[in-house]
Curated annotation (Swiss-Prot):
The keyword Secreted applies. InterPro entries: Dermokine (IPR033541). Residues 293-303, 319-332 have a biased composition (Low complexity). The lineage of its organism: Eukaryota, Metazoa, Chordata, Craniata, Vertebrata. Residues 1-21 form the signal peptide. GO terms for cellular component: extracellular space. Belongs to the dermokine family. Homooligomer. Seems to be able to homodimerize and homotrimerize. Residues 117-362 are annotated as: Disordered. It comes from Bos taurus. May act as a soluble regulator of keratinocyte differentiation. It comes from the Eukaryota. O-glycosylated. This is Dermokine. Residues 124-137, 194-221 have a biased composition (Polar residues).
Amino acid sequence: MKLKGSLACLLLFLLLGSGEASPLQSGEENTREEVGEAIGHGVGEALGDVLGEAAIHGIEKAIGQGTGKTEGLGIREARDPHLGDALAHKLKEASHALKNTGSEADRQAENIIGHGVDPAHKSWQGTPGSNGAWGTNGQPPSGGHGIPGSQGSSGGPGDTQDQVFSGGSGGSFGANAQGGSWGQGGHRGAFNLGANSQGTSPQPGSVRSNNNRNTECTTPPGSGGSSGNSGGSSSSGSSTNGGGSSGGSNGGSNGSTSSNSGSSNGGGSSNSGGSNGGGSNGGGSSNGGGSNAGSSGSSGSSSDTRNSDHGGSSQGYNPSPSSGSRVGSGVRNKPECDNPHVSGGSGGQGQGSSGEGEAVSGINTLNSQTSSESFNFDTFWKNFKSKLGFINWDALNKGQAPPPSTRALLYFRRLWEDFKHNTPFLNWKVITEGEDLPSLQKRAGGAGQPGTGWQDAVAGTAKNYNYNQQGPPAALGGQYPAKTPAKGGVTVSSSASRTYPGLLQWVKFW
């Protein structure tokens, strides 16, 4: 029970120690070391006392079981000084070992507390300030500057990320706004909530250099900013990020505390987009290795060292008239502010305007050709008739049907003969020539026999093509009558021949 109580006290002490270290919002390392040392000593002493008591209790119990005398025997009340000194020495060594273990636990606890304070520091430092820009003037509230010892590490992404929102001018939510040292404190200037602090977002005019919502169409270049608003990239070689120069770089911050502390671009460019990674612009190389491409709204704005002596005309080639000349102008452009003529940006409009001129000239050429060669129906109709020369257009125009040509007659005659050949079940001779009755009588088998008075009617039907006459039917139904007629001279015939007396003569029988 005593061991459990000691462990409970130890846990309570650890909780109190961690709670004591949690309010370290200012990040004072000395306080953190003191708290860690106190925790280490507390852990060592507590473990030493607990284990020492447990060892003494175990020894007393073991000796008591061995001798059978547990009443008057105890290490604390031992009369033998040598035994007491030996046990005390061993317990002291064990206590020192436990204290060393506690020191190690102190270091671990210190690291844990430090890592625990970092996120708390981040969240505390990111709370909105009075100006709605993550603290007053971009600084953390209550004057916090991050945990000491984490400053000065240029671009270390792993150890000093607690300074994401405290270093650099015009940052963009931890994107290392200007490529400067992450752990470097400094005044923030106007804070742009876009992806780039240079006003060089690919969306024209959406991100501005100084977060100015006024309706003016011009922006002063600032100290040393000879490049003006040339696409947000200052290849002039004279603007060292001074006061929002070079197309609104640094978002209006002062040059001394801008995000490129320690690098200052070597008198170089504006670090458009803040992607220079800790001042990699060395030696005035106008974003040399700073990966200005992509963050600037125009192509050709990265590594424009060739234009470094031309007054910042880094926009010599700007394929998009809307990107580069408007971006970084420092205002939200109005319709009358489109394509402002700024220093170094005048050449940026040449290519787009010339391309537009070419397109317009091509359209004008097409329109001129269309207007000169308007649609003429007479010409079209004449060309159409010339392509259909096999048609007698003169006869069609006069409304006269010309006699069919010999070739057409031969063609249709051949089609007719083929059709008759493919339909042998029809008696085409009777249909086309009108065959006499004797052949029909022979085919029916009733020629020269008595009782053939009805055949006259059949003959009249065949000659006159009158199929509706009522009379004795012809014996042509496929069932030939007997050679000898029945009594009374009546010839037997089929039901079909009786129903349709004159129709069956068109059918050929074999």
